[in-house]
Amino acid sequence: MPTIQQLIRSERYNTKKKTKSPALKSCPQRRGVCTRVYTTTPKKPNSALRKVARVRLTSGFEVTAYIPGIGHNLQEHSVVMIRGGRVKDLPGVRYHIIRGTLDTAGVKDRRQGRSKYGAKRPKD
Protein backbone atom coordinates (compact mmCIF):
# COMPACT_ATOMS: atom_id res chain seq x y z
CA MET A 1 0.00 0.00 0.00
CA PRO A 2 1.46 3.38 -0.94
CA THR A 3 1.40 6.26 1.49
CA ILE A 4 -0.68 9.37 0.78
CA GLN A 5 2.57 11.24 0.10
CA GLN A 6 3.57 8.66 -2.54
CA LEU A 7 0.14 8.98 -4.21
CA ILE A 8 0.50 12.79 -4.30
CA ARG A 9 3.94 12.41 -5.90
CA SER A 10 2.76 10.06 -8.66
CA GLU A 11 -0.82 9.04 -9.27
CA ARG A 12 -2.04 5.49 -9.92
CA TYR A 13 -2.34 4.55 -13.57
CA ASN A 14 -4.65 2.04 -15.23
CA THR A 15 -3.01 -0.85 -17.04
CA LYS A 16 -3.83 -0.88 -20.74
CA LYS A 17 -5.74 -3.99 -21.87
CA LYS A 18 -4.00 -5.72 -24.78
CA THR A 19 -6.43 -6.76 -27.52
CA LYS A 20 -6.48 -10.40 -28.62
CA SER A 21 -7.24 -9.49 -32.25
CA PRO A 22 -5.32 -6.30 -33.15
CA ALA A 23 -5.75 -6.67 -36.93
CA LEU A 24 -9.51 -6.08 -36.64
CA LYS A 25 -8.86 -2.53 -35.31
CA SER A 26 -11.88 -2.71 -32.92
CA CYS A 27 -14.25 -3.82 -35.72
CA PRO A 28 -16.34 -7.01 -35.44
CA GLN A 29 -15.22 -8.29 -38.88
CA ARG A 30 -12.78 -7.32 -41.61
CA ARG A 31 -12.57 -8.04 -45.33
CA GLY A 32 -9.41 -9.36 -46.90
CA VAL A 33 -7.85 -11.17 -49.86
CA CYS A 34 -6.29 -14.64 -49.55
CA THR A 35 -2.60 -14.60 -50.43
CA ARG A 36 -1.97 -18.29 -49.69
CA VAL A 37 -4.23 -21.25 -48.83
CA TYR A 38 -2.53 -24.24 -47.23
CA THR A 39 -2.70 -26.91 -44.51
CA THR A 40 -0.71 -27.06 -41.29
CA THR A 41 -0.29 -29.49 -38.40
CA PRO A 42 -1.46 -28.77 -34.83
CA LYS A 43 0.53 -28.72 -31.59
CA LYS A 44 1.72 -31.80 -29.72
CA PRO A 45 -1.08 -34.07 -28.47
CA ASN A 46 -3.23 -33.50 -31.58
CA SER A 47 -2.72 -34.73 -35.13
CA ALA A 48 -4.48 -33.44 -38.27
CA LEU A 49 -4.09 -31.30 -41.38
CA ARG A 50 -5.80 -28.03 -40.47
CA LYS A 51 -6.89 -25.77 -43.34
CA VAL A 52 -5.64 -22.19 -42.99
CA ALA A 53 -5.23 -19.15 -45.23
CA ARG A 54 -2.89 -16.18 -45.18
CA VAL A 55 -5.11 -13.09 -45.61
CA ARG A 56 -4.17 -9.49 -46.47
CA LEU A 57 -6.77 -7.31 -44.69
CA THR A 58 -8.20 -3.90 -45.58
CA SER A 59 -6.64 -2.64 -42.33
CA GLY A 60 -3.21 -3.35 -43.86
CA PHE A 61 -2.37 -6.38 -41.71
CA GLU A 62 -1.50 -9.80 -43.10
CA VAL A 63 -2.84 -12.53 -40.80
CA THR A 64 -3.30 -16.29 -40.70
CA ALA A 65 -6.97 -17.31 -40.49
CA TYR A 66 -8.55 -20.72 -39.91
CA ILE A 67 -11.05 -22.14 -42.43
CA PRO A 68 -13.73 -23.97 -40.38
CA GLY A 69 -15.93 -26.84 -41.57
CA ILE A 70 -15.47 -29.78 -43.93
CA GLY A 71 -14.28 -28.81 -47.43
CA HIS A 72 -13.84 -25.30 -48.83
CA ASN A 73 -13.60 -23.47 -52.17
CA LEU A 74 -10.94 -20.91 -51.25
CA GLN A 75 -7.90 -20.23 -53.38
CA GLU A 76 -5.45 -17.39 -53.89
CA HIS A 77 -7.16 -14.00 -54.56
CA SER A 78 -10.47 -15.12 -52.96
CA VAL A 79 -12.13 -12.25 -51.08
CA VAL A 80 -13.03 -13.34 -47.54
CA MET A 81 -14.48 -11.94 -44.32
CA ILE A 82 -12.66 -12.72 -41.07
CA ARG A 83 -13.69 -12.54 -37.41
CA GLY A 84 -11.71 -12.88 -34.21
CA GLY A 85 -11.30 -16.18 -32.40
CA ARG A 86 -8.18 -18.23 -32.02
CA VAL A 87 -7.53 -21.91 -32.72
CA LYS A 88 -6.01 -23.35 -29.54
CA ASP A 89 -3.80 -25.98 -31.15
CA LEU A 90 -2.49 -23.82 -34.04
CA PRO A 91 0.10 -21.28 -32.82
CA GLY A 92 -0.28 -17.86 -34.46
CA VAL A 93 -3.82 -18.45 -35.77
CA ARG A 94 -6.01 -15.82 -34.05
CA TYR A 95 -8.76 -15.33 -36.64
CA HIS A 96 -11.52 -17.37 -38.32
CA ILE A 97 -12.83 -17.02 -41.86
CA ILE A 98 -16.63 -16.57 -41.95
CA ARG A 99 -18.28 -19.23 -44.13
CA GLY A 100 -21.10 -18.26 -46.51
CA THR A 101 -19.99 -14.64 -47.10
CA LEU A 102 -18.27 -13.03 -50.11
CA ASP A 103 -16.25 -15.69 -52.02
CA THR A 104 -16.45 -18.31 -49.24
CA ALA A 105 -19.15 -20.95 -49.82
CA GLY A 106 -21.08 -22.46 -46.92
CA VAL A 107 -20.47 -26.03 -45.78
CA LYS A 108 -22.28 -28.53 -48.00
CA ASP A 109 -24.78 -31.00 -46.40
CA ARG A 110 -24.52 -29.36 -42.98
CA ARG A 111 -27.63 -30.06 -40.83
CA GLN A 112 -26.74 -28.96 -37.30
CA GLY A 113 -25.10 -25.68 -36.27
CA ARG A 114 -25.76 -24.36 -39.79
CA SER A 115 -25.56 -20.66 -38.93
CA LYS A 116 -21.90 -20.99 -37.93
CA TYR A 117 -21.02 -22.50 -41.31
CA GLY A 118 -23.21 -20.46 -43.71
CA ALA A 119 -25.37 -23.44 -44.69
CA LYS A 120 -28.95 -22.97 -45.90
CA ARG A 121 -31.82 -24.99 -44.41
CA PRO A 122 -32.25 -28.35 -46.20
CA LYS A 123 -35.45 -28.84 -48.24
CA ASP A 124 -36.78 -32.01 -46.48
UniProtKB/Swiss-Prot annotation:
Top-rank taxon, per record: Bacteria
One annotated GO biological process: translation
One MF term in the entry's GO annotations: tRNA binding
PROSITE patterns: RIBOSOMAL_S12 (PS00055)
Keywords: Methylation, Ribonucleoprotein, Ribosomal protein, RNA-binding, rRNA-binding, tRNA-binding
Ranges where the record places region Disordered: 103-124
GO CC annotation terms, alphabetical: small ribosomal subunit
3-methylthioaspartic acid carried by residues: 89
Amino acid composition bias (Basic residues), ranges on this chain: 113-124
Record carries keyword Protein transport: no
Function of the protein: With S4 and S5 plays an important role in translational accuracy.
Subunit structure: Part of the 30S ribosomal subunit. Contacts proteins S8 and S17. May interact with IF1 in the 30S initiation complex.
Family: Belongs to the universal ribosomal protein uS12 family.
Name of the protein in its database record: Small ribosomal subunit protein uS12
Protein species of origin: Acaryochloris marina (strain MBIC 11017)
Lineage of source species: Bacteria, Bacillati, Cyanobacteriota, Cyanophyceae, Acaryochloridales
Primary gene name: rpsL
